[in-house]
Amino acid sequence: MHVGIFADGGYEKGMGHVVRMKRLAEGLKQRCLITFYTNQDSEAFLHEEHWQVIVKPELQQHEFILREIKSKKLDLLLFDILGAPAELLKKIKTETDAKIVLFEEKNGKSIQYSDAVINGIYGDIRSRVYVQGNTRIYEGPDYLILHPAFQAAREDYTLKKDCRNILVALGGSDPKQLIFKVLAAADQVPDIKDKNMMFVMGSASPHQEAVRRRIEKKPQYKMIEQTNDMAGLMKQADAAIVAGGISLYEAICIGVPCLVLSQVEHQTATAKTFADQGAALDLGLGELVPDETLIYQMSRIMSSYPLRLSLHKGGRPLVDGKGIIRVTAILQDLYEQEI
């Protein structure tokens, strides 16, 4: 089986798409050939000896992709991009035998030309499977692709009564620069000098040097540049401040009580859904949150063990961390239908 994976990332787009597909590729690499098609900003992040990475041209991308599918005889195509182009998918369906799987896609025109859709984030909080036309759709956290280490961390995690370690993870690129908002608020939180704060910054963030200067005289603060062990870092945390993307799901999977500052509008829906289930504290779009509100809510989650315990218990049943196993099985079954 030869799998083609299409995913882009960068400062404006964020890194969620390429992170998700890289994780999935790690789970698939022993059973198939893999070729990534990405943009210039993501090439270095995706580089790995187990697969090929090809940077798509800026012009005539659709024609290039069709040629690649035909010349490499790709069997399975995974699209994790913002708005998979229906026109291209239609041509692929007409001119090739490749199976098409879309990730986090809600556009009905695109969905009609796919064989399966995996909506781990866009789906409801309660997972389900249904058929739309000729397409099978898998929705909800059961199909969320997390690194296998999160399942192990979930089993090892114990919530402590004393909140000493706080993790801050605001996305791979933090386009709204929310980390500076959190740093300013932290200065006003009572007893913050007794807390250890870990600021995790992704490879696409341009703010690393500015953050390093900001915290250099605060020994209890630590900046972590691009980690391959987010599960290990989260397992150390007694509370977390996260964006409404993949870091939110990671924290909930392990059981880390979290405060959510969404980077973009679609993240607010996810955060609100979890908050309604008692699984997170949702403050909405981070750039719109008043400083006083952020200071108050940070103080609250750090000081109240009953609140953290309630969030811990409310979230853990919702994300079990086994999504990558389920998705890998779905892809294998889809491929074998044609054999």
From Swiss-Prot:
The chain crosses the membrane at residues 241-261. It is found in: Cell membrane. GO terms for cellular component: plasma membrane. The keyword Transmembrane helix applies. One of its GO terms (molecular function) is glycosyltransferase activity. Keywords: Cell membrane, Membrane, Transmembrane, Transmembrane helix. Pfam families: Glyco_tran_28_C (PF04101). Its main location: membrane. Pathway: Spore coat biogenesis; spore coat polysaccharide biosynthesis. It comes from the Bacteria. To M.jannaschii MJ1062. This is Spore coat polysaccharide biosynthesis protein SpsG. It comes from Bacillus subtilis (strain 168). The gene is spsG.
